[in-house]
Amino acid sequence: MGIKPIQLEIAKKTLLNDIVPKTNNENILLDQSIIRISSDTITSNINLPSTANSAVDGYGFLAKTFHENNNLEFEVVGIAKAGHPLNKVLKNNQAVEIYTGAKMPEGIDTIAMHENCIRTENKVKIKHYHVKNQNMRPIGENLRKGELVIKKGKLINAPDIGQLAASGNSHVNVYKKLKISIISTGDELVDSSVTKLKDGEIYDVNRPMLLSLFDNKYLEIEDQG
């Protein structure tokens, strides 16, 4: 019987009526999720930061002791670095040399930057007034455990992936890609690899053009020839 042509508007209406919303999802690795659409709301698995830590390089001390004792020189009793905490409880007159991102040892609540301190052997003097909790980052300052990171239906971008990684999410649920089949019909069509055309033949333009047009991370393409 062959294929009967129909009016464009009727064809468009028929296609729209046959569309079924795509709800299937899949769980994929975080580093594969760029330009995918989240199928679930995603929350943080941890507090970020997980512990109170230093926002600067400098010296940590107890603000109350500093306020009550003018010109006090603190005894420096250790060093705290990111990933290498000082597991010691500091006394009131003690300080710790501390670096950005390092966990705050127990017994201190304030950080003075290096340039605001005078170090002499195992002593340090704080040059300027500092308020309690200055230059420290409290637990959960960036994200609290259970806080929203990505909404359902969000197109995931590179900053989203960074935020998801920081919040302890190694996998994400996303909608499966839309599937498109491309078929180019016509007895006169030949592939561009053919070097010599026969009478009546033309090179197939639509197929390679459409395959290229839809070649992206949003779609799964089926080449039907």
Regions of interest found by a model, annotated:
Residues 2, 59-223:
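Short, glycine/charged-enriched hinge/interface segments at domain edges or termini
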Residues 1-69, 122:
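Short, low-complexity N-terminal leaders and the immediately following helix N-cap/first helix
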